[in-house]
Regions:
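Short cysteine-rich clusters marking metal-coordination/redox-active sites
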Residues: 37
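Beta-strand-rich cores of mature extracytoplasmic or soluble domains
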Residues: 100-149, 154
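Positively charged n-region of N-terminal signal peptides that target proteins for export
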Residues: 1-4
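Cys/His-coordinated zinc-binding microdomains
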Residues: 41
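Mid-length scaffold segments of soluble, non-membrane domains
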Residues: 62-102, 107
Length: 164
């Protein structure tokens, strides 16, 4: 009897875990007065340049906000930060009409599918060079050709660039 009960509990537990994994990720949130950068504790509306938001497992309504793309990458690599990341969104700079205020018409894209222009000299929201995310590879390549820099994917982002 105990073995049967344990088997039934195990089946339900595994089923619940599988359902949680198969649920769609949370949708990106728009930047508001309550969007505060994880590292700088400043309101994101006060900064220009691309932004990022990370949703952790079990917290679908509470994104972790980032004032820069480099900060977001740092968060994913630093050992002291949470690793239960559900989804990451970044600003699609290919669809921004006002680069001095990308918050006004932000389109969010999956960070792992984005193309990043690095080493372009672009100064982000915290006054330092930052990566520029694009949802379209051709737009990223055109930007890099016109303004300088190179295009990399999420998994190819060099640690030396993130932490310099």
């Amino acid at each position: 009897m105990k073995k049967t009960l344990l088997a039934i509990i195990a089946v339900f537990a595994l089923s619940a875990c599988r359902q949680a994994e198969e649920a769609p990720p949370p949708l990106p949130q728009q930047i508001s007065d309550r969007s505060v950068g994880h590292y700088c504790s400043m309101n994101l509306t006060e900064h220009n340049g691309p932004k990022a938001q990370i949703f952790l497992n079990g917290k679908p309504d509470q994104p972790v906000w980032f004032s820069t793309i480099k900060q977001m990458f740092g968060y994913t690599k630093l050992p002291e930060e949470p690793k239960g990341i559900r989804v990451i969104y970044v600003t699609d700079m290919g669809n921004v009409t006002d680069w001095t205020n990308p918050n006004a018409d932000t389109e969010w894209i999956d960070a792992k599918k984005a193309f990043y222009v690095i080493d372009s000299g672009f100064i982000g929201g915290m006054g330092a060079e930052d990566a520029l995310p694009f949802g379209n590879k051709e737009q990223a390549e055109k930007f890099a050709k016109d303004k300088g820099g190179k295009v990399v994917g999420f998994d190819d982002m060099p640690d030396a660039y993130i932490f310099k």
